């Protein structure tokens, strides 16, 4: 690891981990994570909270594993194979939290490691809270969803010449507003569903039309608007209600349906609809030691795609092409972090991204080389 004249790293860290009772708790005096050759060590300044931050440890409990995915902070250590980052760089990214194969890898901590290939430089003018509010976990997942599962044409530098209409179910969620923006940048026409109170939010991020997903006539209204030709749907929820709505909204010829949760088997009954499932950690290409259909073997091809997608994401950040979802700052402590996870679990959050700054949990950065 690189060293410098700025002092030495602390000998321990604090983190939010899963306890033996399968509840999140704060653990102090944990060892710093080992830094692999392609990784950077980050002093975490802010984290964002995602639904996966409770779903992962609920479904695949691993006592002692550090929770959390999204992070923003300052690089205080650099592995020998890392060329594009240096000490003191402001960065953001996403890791696989609650990871049974690498339980130390989550972001809900004051010091963490991140693979350099999946780490982004924060542009000047963006605070740590604003950067983490972009939701890199969601951006990574959407790269797989739009290109690998929906197989949409177009790219950042060469938008599609024949725009496709794409339904984003839950368009006012943080994943939804980012999906809408990415679809616009790729040259497509996003339409969305959400509750009426968030119609303006979805439109502000670029939705062409918005439909009330609580209305019994929602699917019929979408079919009428698309003239029964809709053939691309992104569904972050993938529960019984959303599956029913999305299937009814799909055009008569069928199409591609991308789920961000594991889908029920009955969705495969309509042969004209090609169903696919993606989840954030898949982008890293590592083996997923999970269960219930979420397990995956190592995937070098997906990793190669992910590396290229992150290069595009860096370009979008540098060019100021992405707007962050509205954020709600919860505080500056690990206690606030646990409360935020519980708020999401209780479904108390709508139209906002929960963010926690961690400045009160740590001293000023110390850089080592």
Swiss-Prot record:
Signal sequence, renumbered to the chain: none
Gene3D superfamilies membership: Medium-chain alcohol dehydrogenases, catalytic domain, NAD(P)-binding Rossmann-like Domain
Keyword Oxidoreductase: yes
Keyword terms of this UniProt record: NADP, Nucleotide-binding, Oxidoreductase
Recorded family membership: Belongs to the zinc-containing alcohol dehydrogenase family.
Function: Trans-enoyl reductase; part of the gene cluster that mediates the biosynthesis of the mycotoxin pyrichalasin H, a tyrosine-derived cytochalasan that inhibits the growth of rice seedlings, but also inhibits lymphocyte capping and actin polymerization and alters cell morphology. Pyrichalasin H is indicated as the responsible agent for the genus-specific pathogenicity of M.grisea toward crabgrass. The first step in the pathway is catalyzed by the O-methyltransferase pyiA which methylates free tyrosine to generate the precursor O-methyltyrosine.
Name of this protein: Trans-enoyl reductase pyiC
Organism: Pyricularia grisea (Crabgrass-specific blast fungus)
């Amino acid at each position: 690891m690189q060293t410098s004249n700025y002092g030495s790293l602390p000998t321990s860290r604090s983190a939010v981990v899963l306890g033996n009772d399968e509840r999140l708790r704060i653990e102090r005096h944990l060892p710093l994570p080992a830094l692999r050759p392609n990784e950077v060590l980050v002093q975490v300044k802010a984290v964002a909270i995602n639904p996966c931050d409770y779903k992962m440890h609920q479904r695949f409990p691993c006592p002692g594993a550090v929770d959390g995915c999204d992070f923003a902070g300052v690089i205080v250590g650099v592995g020998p194979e890392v060329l594009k980052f240096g000490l003191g760089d402001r960065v953001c990214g996403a890791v696989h939290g609650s990871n049974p194969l690498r339980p130390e890898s989550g972001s809900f901590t004051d010091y963490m490691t991140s693979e350099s290939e999946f780490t982004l430089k924060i542009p000047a003018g963006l605070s740590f809270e604003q950067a983490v509010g972009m939701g890199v976990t969601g951006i990574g997942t959407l790269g797989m969803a739009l290109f690998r599962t929906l197989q949409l044409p177009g790219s950042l530098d060469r938008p599609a010449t024949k725009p496709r209409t794409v339904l984003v179910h839950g368009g006012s969620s943080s994943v939804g507003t980012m999906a809408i923006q990415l679809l616009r940048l790729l040259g497509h026409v996003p339409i969305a569903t959400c509750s009426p109170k968030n119609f303006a939010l979805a439109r502000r991020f670029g939705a062409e039309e918005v439909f009330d997903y609580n209305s019994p006539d929602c699917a019929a209204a979408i079919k009428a608007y698309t003239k029964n030709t809709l053939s691309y749907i992104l569904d972050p929820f993938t529960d019984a209600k959303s599956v029913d709505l999305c299937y009814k909204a799909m055009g008569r010829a069928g199409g591609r349906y991308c789920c961000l949760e594991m889908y029920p088997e009955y969705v495969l009954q309509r042969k004209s609809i090609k169903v696919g499932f993606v989840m954030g950690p898949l982008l890293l290409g590592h083996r997923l030691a999970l269960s219930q259909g979420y397990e995956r073997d190592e995937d070098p091809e997906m990793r190669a795609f992910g590396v290229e997608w992150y290069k595009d994401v860096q370009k979008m950040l540098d060019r100021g092409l992405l707007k962050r979802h509205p954020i709600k700052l919860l505080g500056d402590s690990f206690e606030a972090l646990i409360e935020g996870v519980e708020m999401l679990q209780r479904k108390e959050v709508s139209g906002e991204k929960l963010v926690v700054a961690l400045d009160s949990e740590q001293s000023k950065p110390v850089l080592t080389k």
